[in-house]
Amino acid sequence: ALPIFYPLPALLVSCGSTEEEYNIITVAWAGTICTNPAMCYISVRPERHSYPILKRNMEFVINLTTKSMAFATDWCGVRSGKDYNKFEEMKLTPGKAKIVSAPIIEESPLCIECRVKEIISLGSHDMFIADVVNVKADDKYLNAETGKFELSEANPLVYVHGGYFELGPKIGKFGWSVEKNRSQTKEKS
């Protein structure tokens, strides 16, 4: 059966506790599962090269991808870390994370450091449920007034039925459908 919920995020997940062990895996089955405490998940097949690295270290970094990272995102999903140093091959820069031992990808506009809380065997994939322990955002994507990360400015990649796409323009904001003056609110959002 194919997944029916689209689009999915096209993410690069970095893992490993030493430079020799560092690896990158492309993940689309990922998301937020709780706001407070901040938690997320990634789902990975046990036969993937990154799986034992993730399981051994119980940490990883979710790195948001952008249009400019599309080639590397695809390549890291079809090549194995057994055969390639993905950081070197894709000319991506491993950076030091603030809390976890896994590296961040410096080229990513948003890096989410995660510590695994639980692994659930589901079938084809195991779900790594994790606490978010730190978030690093590129300052150029932060709203000067609110300090919030402006996702649309980063040109994030999404994955749909075997293809990579960028998101389109914003068409509304949460709650705009019930505001008194919807048409004006929609234009301002």
Give, region by region, the residue ranges found by the protein language model.
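Basic, polyanion-binding surface patches
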Residues: 1-189
